[in-house]
Curated annotation (Swiss-Prot):
It comes from Campylobacter jejuni (strain RM1221). Its cofactor is pyridoxal 5'-phosphate. InterPro entries: Ala_racemase, Ala_racemase/Decarboxylase_C, Ala_racemase_C, Ala_racemase_N, Ala_racemase_pyridoxalP-BS, PLP-binding_barrel. Its EC number is 5.1.1.1. The keyword Isomerase applies. SUPFAM superfamilies: Alanine racemase C-terminal domain-like, PLP-binding barrel. NCBIfam families: alr, PRK00053.2-2. It comes from the Bacteria. This is Alanine racemase.
């Protein structure tokens, strides 16, 4: 069966490197949404906890429940209020019109729209939002924003930072001891993080976004069959690849049903061991030169992202959660 190997030492190295950058593990919010970006949330949770991480963020209540035994604080980022929220968790308030729909006395972090215009409350509407939060009997314990262009060299990043500083000044008039967080993975290595803020880290904890970090995930497939492909014979759907000489080929147990982008046989898609995929990828398998019982499909998602003209996030989060993940 196909297999995802998670490098424990690389993950721990990355978290230590990040914690050193921001000052401590206590100021770190590890984002574990979407199965920890495809890496396996439940597999990584005890590693993060043992290093001193006590705060994580996830997408949904279901994700929070999966790892609640490991962390003191779990922020749910994409929640639609239903009135029966769990007091064990913290909920993002993304739209002030939804405030009355939350269960009373539930802990919330208020999302501020500082310029991304996706979720959150505009700074000019913040005082009105505070009134609604107080009248709804919600427990405001934090406030945050998300930078839209922290990885791009334009001025919008600094405009958003300034807008968040304005929001902090306003909310501090009404509340004390709030937890603030604005810097994401892209912003982490772009400048100093304000001393009164935590830092949310997503993909950087898995080795992307800074050259000093180490890749954590590698994807492997196992051989289903092998044969001699004779000169002039083709392999796979449509016969896209034809052997120019006799060659030993093998078929491996990984395909687009496992969350991989479908290779259509055009161009050279280089695998983790340097071999290239031969012919079109099938639903549950692909072929290449025989590389033994096990083959590394990729250990750097950037290579596949570049080939398919997408981003490394998409390569990783699409990996089927049913693929076994193991620590190595």
């Amino acid at each position: 069966m196909s297999l995802i190997k998670i490098d424990q030492k690389a993950y721990e190295y990355n978290l230590r490197h990040i914690a050193k950058k921001i000052g401590s593990f206590q100021r770190l919010i590890c984002v574990f949404k979407d199965n920890a970006y495809g890496h396996g949330a439940k597999l990584l949770a005890p590693l993060a906890k043992n290093l001193g991480v006590s705060f994580v963020a996830v997408k949904s209540e279901e994700e929070a429940q999966e790892i609640e035994e490991f962390f003191e604080n779990i922020l749910i980022l994409s929640h639609r209020p239903h009135g029966n929220e769990n007091s064990r968790f913290i909920y993002a308030l993304n739209d002030i019109s939804q405030a009355k729909k939350y269960k009373q006395d539930i802990k919330i972090h208020l999302k501020i729209d500082t310029g991304m215009h996706r979720n959150g409350i505009c700074v000019e509407n913040l005082e009105h939002a505070i009134d609604l939060i107080q009248s709804s009997d919600l427990k405001l314990t934090g406030m945050f924003t998300h930078f839209a262009s922290a990885d791009e060299m334009d001025g919008s990043f600094f405009v958003q930072k300034e807008n968040f500083q304005k929001a902090k000044k306003i909310v501090k008039k009404y509340f004390s001891n709030l937890l603030f967080h604005s810097h994401n993975s892209a912003a982490l290595f772009r400048g100093k993080i304000p001393e009164d803020e935590y830092c949310r880290v997503g993909l950087v904890q898995f080795g992307y976004g800074d050259s000093n970090l180490k890749r954590v995930l590698s994807l492997y497939a196992h051989r289903l069959s092998q044969r001699i492909l004779q000169k002039g014979q083709s392999i796979g759907y449509g016969g896209i690849f034809t052997a120019a000489k006799d060659m030993e080929v093998a078929t491996y147990d990984l395909g687009y049903a496992d969350g991989l982008f479908r290779y259509n046989g055009k161009g050279e898609l280089v695998l983790g061991n340097g071999k290239v995929m031969l012919g079109k990828m099938s639903m549950d398998s692909f072929s290449c030169e025989n590389s033994g019982e096990e083959i590394c499909v990729f250990k750097d998602a950037d290579i596949w992202a570049d080939f398919f003209h997408t981003i490394n996030y998409e390569i990783l989060v699409k990996l089927n959660p049913n693929i076994q993940r193991v620590l190595v």
